[in-house]
């Protein structure tokens, strides 16, 4: 198992892309808390069943920015918290997130996660599902140990909402009758709910009051929506090294994301027939991904998706208007910009 300090870099490195500077600044501001969170993650991955820490360490070693736990840590400190409860809750948030990744990769039959072989590709589907269950259980142990019914309500509700979002995505898969509102319901559930809860519990442990908790919940929700919109755009616009997974996975899986919806509705009858064949009937040839990329580019669906994301990022920033100016507040504002800069 890796030492805790290896889990995340909290300082900018020469290899960091410019758009990552915002997250590096946020990480630096909560560096001591983040190190304590990393230690808690390692400690709580421990199990006498050797496969559990081995598989969990594999996905942890694959990297990731620890954005969600950083949001919990930063939200608590923004609200003036001086205790340590937020550290365990940040680890809880990361366990929920990691469990969903393990389950998602099995459902999606993904071979890559963050540029490395996915856990299911290395350890198998059964092990990935069961270790994901273990991490969910660990997360709930941490909630109970915290002792706050408010925290338990927020994070358990988020876990249920994530599952609902994933099921809704399954229902809408291969369905071009899905509208933009339904698509947004999917990403609110599967992605944004945990962003929102991560921020909200930071305010709750600080005892800042309902207004602050609601503002941070809104910040996290809109940040998460923007993040997922950009993620869905990148699946049709990024290279594999940047994306960390195979480009075009959403297309091959028949996922109905906003770039596809926009291109489909703007397309000619011939173009719509292409989308019906490849997405609805899942009849895809070796040249179809390239044609899909060309249609999405023709109708500027990536640009339109990023424009939608920018609107949610601005809304996230507006949610922080009631907090006094500080380096932490600025870092959270910059984190919203980071979500957009990933697409540039």
Regions found by a protein language model. Give the residues of each.
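All-alpha prenyltransferase/terpene-synthase fold signal
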Residues: 1-344
């Amino acid at each position: 198992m890796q030492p805790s300090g290896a889990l995340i870099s909290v300082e900018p490195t020469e290899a960091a892309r410019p758009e990552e500077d915002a997250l590096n600044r946020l990480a630096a501001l909560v560096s001591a808390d983040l190190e304590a969170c990393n230690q808690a993650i390692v400690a709580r991955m421990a199990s006498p069943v050797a496969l559990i820490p081995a598989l969990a360490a594999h996905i942890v070693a694959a990297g990731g920015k620890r954005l969600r736990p950083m949001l919990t840590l930063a939200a608590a400190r923004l609200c003036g918290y001086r205790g340590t409860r937020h550290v365990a809750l940040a680890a809880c948030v990361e366990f929920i997130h990691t469990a969903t990744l393990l389950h998602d990769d099995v459902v999606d039959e993904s071979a890559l996660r963050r540029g490395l072989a996915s856990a299911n590709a290395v350890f198998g589907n059964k092990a990935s599902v069961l270790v994901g269950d273990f991490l969910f259980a660990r997360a709930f142990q941490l909630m109970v140990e915290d002792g706050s019914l408010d925290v338990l309500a927020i994070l358990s509700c988020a876990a249920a909402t994530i599952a609902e979002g994933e099921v809704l995505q399954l229902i809408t898969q291969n369905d071009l009758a899905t509208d933009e509102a339904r698509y947004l319901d999917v990403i609110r559930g599967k992605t944004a709910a945990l962003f929102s809860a991560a921020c909200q519990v930071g305010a709750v442990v600080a005892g800042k009051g309902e207004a602050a908790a609601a503002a941070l919940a809104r910040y996290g929700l809109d940040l998460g929506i923007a993040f997922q919109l950009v993620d869905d755009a990148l699946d049709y616009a990024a290279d594999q090294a940047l994306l960390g997974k195979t480009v075009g996975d959403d297309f091959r899986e028949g996922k109905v994301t906003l770039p596809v919806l926009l291109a489909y509705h703007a397309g000619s009858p011939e173009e719509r027939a292409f989308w019906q064949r490849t997405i609805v009937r899942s009849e895809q040839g070796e040249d179809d991904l390239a044609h899909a990329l060309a249609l999405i580019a023709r109708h500027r669906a990536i640009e339109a998706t990023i424009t939608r994301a920018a609107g949610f990022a601005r809304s996230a920033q507006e949610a922080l208007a009631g907090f006094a100016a500080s380096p932490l507040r600025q870092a959270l504002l910059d984190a919203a910009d980071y979500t957009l800069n990933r697409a540039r």
